[in-house]
């Protein structure tokens, strides 16, 4: 044509090596004239392979270019702006058509599969085959079985009416009311809400209260079982999306269980964990239903608890059906997190042989009616499956509603993500305790530490346990202890001070004991920090007791190998001072607790003498992941951690003397200097 070769639709000569008409756009010419059939004239535009490839590449990056981007693309490819615009429109339409087609094919296949399944089920029903044994059943018996079940149901309803007429004033009406109020939270506050049941007035409980409690407990148990299911839709896979997803999921959860709307300022935390525990199902249930044993097992979390009322001791010689009212305090080892006071009922039920559920729930619908500092315990507890080999499979669920404003900002992510008092910490604490019991009962302790009698090893373990408990209490100050918080001027904001005056108390130094504690954030993960603090080679870099010299281990008792739980008796080389120490590092966090002990006293303990008279003042470190960026749920291999340093010092031998403010300032300086030395040794930003 015209001696110039063929031109493409836009008047461009194709580049060498490119075929003519690689792709054709068919578009409507809005300015064209109608043809004979009344349609619009259609105009074709041929594009080269080069133009098509460039358009495809741009589409992969941005399928919706702006007007400016379309203009620049047209200039670069010698195409009109409308051509570029139409190409992208056509491309998007084509992609949508392909996707719709693929979805239709998939849905059709799924539809055909469901129809086939339906036909199979219909055929099975017509043949009346037993789903278990596959043998034919007698269809004539079906109607009889239905009538029998209806008769049994009617008998049960009569028994319920008789029970309610005996204990409640309006049987049927009252039964409906309690069943509506039974969920962990019910309808709106003040409307058909369960009354706040008095936990403070005596130990007698009316049958009416018992009936209400039992209904609450049964409903909470059903809710816990639902939340424990593997495919339960209320759990988020990744807690990092909590800020975006928890509201929607919480609304779904609340509507499913008829829960009350959260009051303003209240935060809901929920977590779930699953693992093996080296304890039989029955033993674990008995431990949970005995408040004293429960506190002993979960001492790092529960400093104090009491059974207020026993409403039922169970049936058939077991704990199944046992119902109790319990008051307790939960703690995070930090002065920046106040104790969480909880009041709840605990219900235990055997679902089938070897499968037990223990559930807690606070018996009030409105947490604002609880005493100050208390939180509401939503259905929480354990689903325990006995594995018949000395182990149990435990699914732990923790839910709570509390006021976040009482918690320091450093710890709000830790608590909000269910780390500080979440299911994973409870389960790890249980696993560590059970493994310790298993190790100490099955291992010859004299083989662990040569030269130490079995009785002596037992007493050292007992002494270390008392030391660790005293360390906890020196930071969190449970209500049953004698610690008194003091206000000190011109000290660090995160620092807390308490005093305790001891007068001839067994196992306590006589005089005034000062307890100081502080919590700081460090840009290092839990395991790295624990390894540094617990390793004897680095001890002189931060511990003032060593006086810049080394320490050696004279006794070592490994309580729980998998959790790094070790009790040691350390000796400072240059002065012979002995230091008792216990450490662990697991999913619940890490702990290093130590205390200087008098040489003569510890020698008696090593020979098997009672350790109750040994006096000491513990110090130590508590380490937990900071809860930011999901570091806790990825094993805390990255991110930061929260370090709590607690120190107890005898500041006066006269219990009646006044505390000197200068002493407090010296202790503050000592603690600050210790933390600075840790940061410096780890090359952390200060």
Swiss-Prot record:
One of its GO terms (cellular component) is nucleus. The keyword GTP-binding does not apply. Signal peptide: none annotated. Residues 1-24, 173-202 are annotated as: Disordered. It is found in: Nucleus. Residues 103-170 form a coiled coil. CDD domains: homeodomain, START_ArGLABRA2_like. Residues 206-439 form the START domain. One of its GO terms (biological process) is positive regulation of flower development. Interacts with FT. Probable transcription factor involved in the regulation of time of flowering through the photoperiod flowering pathway. May repress FT. This is Homeobox-leucine zipper protein HDG6. It comes from Arabidopsis thaliana (Mouse-ear cress). The gene is HDG6.
